[in-house]
A protein has these predicted regions:
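Juxtamembrane/interfacial segments flanking transmembrane helices
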Residues: 31-36, 125-136
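Short amphipathic alpha-helical coupling elements at transmembrane boundaries
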Residues: 38-45, 134-142
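Membrane-interface helix termini and inter-helical loops of multi-pass transporters
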Residues: 31-40, 94-101
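Structural signature of hydrophobic alpha-helical transmembrane segments
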Residues: 46-56, 108-110
């Protein structure tokens, strides 16, 4: 029984860590991320659509596509990761909390990179994902010889270039904890 519950609790905990870093470090300092999270941040900064809601809206069509390609069994942990992340984001969006890092974007990007990297690593090591670009990378990996880690790096790079074009702020894109933590989490999982 404990073996079945432990991965579930672990994925939920990882989602909480990731959502905490995103809500309290990335968003207040207008930093960005790659992948689907980057798209949710674009919509938040431009249109004030809550990150928690946009995370779900982006993932619904991706899950439908992945369901058709991979079948239902392989998606349960990803559904749990995505749903948990959206719930934690919604919870943290309602809890006002500030950390005085005196606007030091280097420290902010390091702290957010560590939190997001740990959160993703915990989720991945428990067999889950946060959906989004992870699903896109898995689908592309199925039909190419490119590793999931390299595909994620390419997707993240593309989103960051889109962010640079839209917001024209190289400084914020540079301070973004680029996909390095994401890439390292996949190396830990053994997908490179």
């Amino acid at each position: 029984m404990l073996r079945k519950i432990q991965p579930i609790i672990t994925i939920i905990l990882g989602a909480a860590i990731y959502a905490f870093g995103l809500t309290y470090f990335v968003v207040p300092h207008h930093l960005f991320e790659g992948g689907a999270t980057g798209v949710t941040l674009i919509t938040y900064y431009l249109f004030k659509i809550p990150v928690s809601l946009m995370n779900l809206l982006i993932n619904i069509p991706l899950f439908i596509l992945a369901w058709k390609i991979f079948g239902p069994k392989t998606l349960y942990s990803s559904l749990l990761g995505t749903f948990s992340l959206s719930v934690w984001l919604a919870v943290f969006e309602r809890i006002p909390l500030q950390f005085d890092l005196q606007g030091d974007l280097i420290i902010v990007s390091l702290v957010s990179g560590v939190l997001l990297g740990i959160g993703l690593g915990v989720i991945f090591n428990a067999g889950g994902t946060t959906g989004g670009s992870d699903i896109v990378a898995r689908i592309l990996n199925k039909y190419t010889n490119i590793s999931i880690g390299k595909l994620l790096f390419g997707i993240d790079f593309f989103i960051l270039m889109l962010i640079l074009i839209l917001f024209q702020d190289l400084r914020l894109v540079t301070y973004t904890p680029v996909s390095y933590t994401h890439l390292r989490a996949h190396e830990t999982r053994g997908n490179l």
